[in-house]
Design a protein with these regions (language model features):
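Bacterial Sec-dependent N-terminal signal peptides
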Residues: 1-28, 32, 220-228
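Short glycine/proline- and aromatic-enriched beta-strand/turn motifs that initiate or cap beta-hairpins
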Residues: 19-67, 227
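Short loop/turn motifs that connect adjacent beta-strands in outer-membrane beta-barrel proteins
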Residues: 19-27, 75-76, 128-134
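Transmembrane beta-strands of outer-membrane beta-barrel proteins
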Residues: 27-33, 64, 79-83, 117-119, ...
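Transmembrane beta-strands of outer-membrane beta-barrel pores
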Residues: 35-39, 74-76, 85-89, 127, ...
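Extracellular/periplasm-exposed beta-strand and loop segments of Gram-negative cell-envelope proteins
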Residues: 38-61, 88-116, 142-175, 195-221
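Transmembrane beta-barrel domains of outer membrane proteins
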Residues: 69-73, 122-126, 177-181, 188, ...
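Outer-membrane beta-barrel "beta-signal"
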Residues: 183-186, 214-228
């Protein structure tokens, strides 16, 4: 009996330490770099009552990102705060048809490059956690701030001269992602679903006209980084 009591007393601190370890909250920081491509749910332009998107060809160009982050983890669940600095690049080629031939030529193109700051807050869950190998899924809201004073736009061969798109300075998204971590190195694959429109309107300065632009962008991104 005495031996049993001694064994229980010896094992009690070990079990208590394990319990404290399971309930411990970990705070980590890291840095990641990556690239992103933009697609659109509805790349529709409207000019003088004409709308055209069915003949639109999207040329998805690559933008680049740099992001410091902080992660707070409890057991298998974590919350991650990021600040993503990056560029977005994309273009549209519009095909002229009978209904819009008075607006477009055969080689009409619109290209755009922007500088932006993205602030996501995601909640993740480590589905697989074996030693140094971890696979997780995550989701959460993202706000994108566009530095409109530094954007680069080009409208080619539109029949209205000196056109410019007035972009929204703040847009909202919802993130869905998959992460793989090996030791301190990780890879993230993310899809951002656009919730709000990215454009206010398009103006023709020479003709003093304002055109509607109705589109929400989605963002596909890949990043690699280290967490400490």
């Amino acid at each position: 009996m005495r031996s049993l009591i001694i064994c229980i007393l010896l094992l009690f601190p070990l079990s208590l330490g394990a319990q404290e370890s399971d309930n411990r909250i970990w705070v980590n920081a890291g840095l990641k770099v990556g690239f992103q491509a933009i697609t659109y749910n509805n790349p529709t332009f409207g000019i003088d009552g004409y709308t055209y998107n069915e003949n639109t060809i999207q040329s998805n160009k690559i933008g680049y990102t740099l992001a410091p982050f902080m992660r707070v983890t409890a057991k298998r669940v974590y919350v991650q705060f990021e600040t993503i600095f990056g560029t977005s690049r994309h273009s549209f080629d519009f095909k002229s048809t009978g209904s819009n031939s008075d607006l477009l030529s055969n080689t009409t193109e619109y290209s755009l490059k922007t500088l932006c700051l993205q602030v996501p807050i995601v909640i993740g869950y480590n589905m697989i956690q074996e030693g140094k190998y971890v696979m997780s899924v995550f989701t959460g809201p993202k706000t994108k701030f566009v530095f409109t004073a530094h954007d680069e736009q080009e409208f080619k061969h539109f029949k209205y001269g000196q056109m410019e798109e007035v972009l929204k300075k703040r847009c909202y998204y919802w993130d869905f992602g998959l992460g793989v971590k090996i030791g301190n190195v990780f890879f993230d694959f993310t899809y951002d679903l656009g919730i709000t429109k990215v454009s206010e309107y398009i103006i023709s300065k020479s003709e003093n006209l304002k055109f509607k632009s109705d589109r929400r962008d989605n963002i596909l991104s890949f990043s690699v980084g280290m967490i400490f």
